[in-house]
Amino acid sequence: MNLALDEAKLAFSKKEVPVGAVLVKDDVVISHSYNQSISKKDPSAHAEMNVLREAAKKIDNYRLNGASLYVTLEPCLMCFGACIHARIDRLIFAAEDQKSGVVINNLNLQDESFFNHKISVSRGSLATESSVLLKKFFQERRN
């Protein structure tokens, strides 16, 4: 989660929404990234999506069985859906997203039985640090 937070800080320095993600498989970091929607002018360039795309290219397969995704913010609907399609095993997030998060907030999708793949979800460390960084970013944007 520390590497994911480092990615979020990098996003912050580039005036992107400070969310970072890291994908690990067999105790090896396969990919890491941060939100790049603003710079890429791409609404799908969330940290999670960037990490999943990069990992799929590296292992030459979009199925990421056995992988764990660490992310500094609870995923949105798009990102959680991509995690299911990628067949990751574990999702560990730091801060809850009460506005757009769908894993435990709003839609609470982690408990839905209609998905063809079940992801083990847990809250990781650094929730406070991740939340503080996000709040600082949006406060600066408003001023």
Region spans (language model):
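Small-residue (primarily alanine) positions within well-ordered alpha-helices
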Residues: 4, 8-11, 21, 31-33, ...
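Helix-adjacent hinge/juxtasegments
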Residues: 41, 45, 49-82
